[in-house]
Amino acid sequence: MSGNFEGIKRQKFGVEIECTGLTREDAAEAVANVLGGTPDYFGGSYDKYNVLDSKDRKWSIVYDSSIKCVDKNGNSASRNYAVELVTPVLEYEDMPLLQEVVRAVRKAGGVTGAEYCAGIHVHIDGAPYTAQSLRNLVNIFASKENFLFDMLQVSPMRESYCQKVDRNFLEKLNKQKPKTIEEIQKLWYDGDISQVHHHYSSTRYRACNLHSFFANRNWEMRACNSTLHAGVIRSYVILALAISNAALTKKFCSPHISESENLRYSARVWLINLGLNGEEYKNCRKHLISHLEGNIAWLHPEDAIKQRERLKAERIAAREQRVEPVREVQQQDDNVPAEIPEPTVSEYDEDFEQEETFEMSM
């Protein structure tokens, strides 16, 4: 399988993880235990705690007003239990560190999920983007959003915070084919570009959030239910990196909506086409598609049944062909004088043919 997939590991990213079950102070202590630093209480409107890592990068624990707060026993709790972990700008090699931080927060009592109005936001560096690659990015999301929302298990409780691509914006984007990022910005804000300065612009609540791109030069994938499973978070980040790499390297991505009667198979094919193939991404693929319905090996499951029946018929036919010569030899042996040595069965017997293994070609 060929493709330009090296960029998956070359892009920078950041993650915001919302949770509750512990206080911001406790979360900061848990993060500091991993990073080897000391929590520094900054305060401010987000009641922020900062922790520096060995590279002097700032990991922050901040307040988020949207979180439904509970304590470690699941009882309603104060706003001190509204926790959002904000990473610094990270590189692919930092993935194990991110996972250790996540595990530490969970071990300290962190809980999360749609029932707490919590989510995960993955930010990808926008520096390499041009107008064409930004258009590609939007088209990828538009064409694969049905896949993504099922793969990432977007809860209906959170859909107001991660809406699908605005179809009016999508239509204008592909009809006008803007040549500059500034032109795309005007389309995104429907002409009101002053919104770029409003942190809580209503345009930010999209699964593919370009408000973040125009304001901070990084685009945001919001279509993730929150989790404190380190492997799942790694899968979310890698998926966002792979989508971004496709947007940056492909000449054109179609906005045509992908549909499938076998979502498990189609999602796997799409992930492999994004470059998430091989042993390195095995767990990533597993986390993203294991809960989907369908047959992972066959686009049309009925073909698998036909294939098994065909192979069974071939094995039966092969056995009959091997048995028949032996019968003929035995009949001939009855008419042969005793002094002529009788052929051994091993001269006629053959090994049974092994069942053919089929692999899906991509």
PLM feature spans:
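C-terminal accessory/tail domains of diverse enzymes
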Residues: 1-114, 127-362
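Short, conserved phosphate-binding/catalytic loop or strand-edge motifs used
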Residues: 116-124
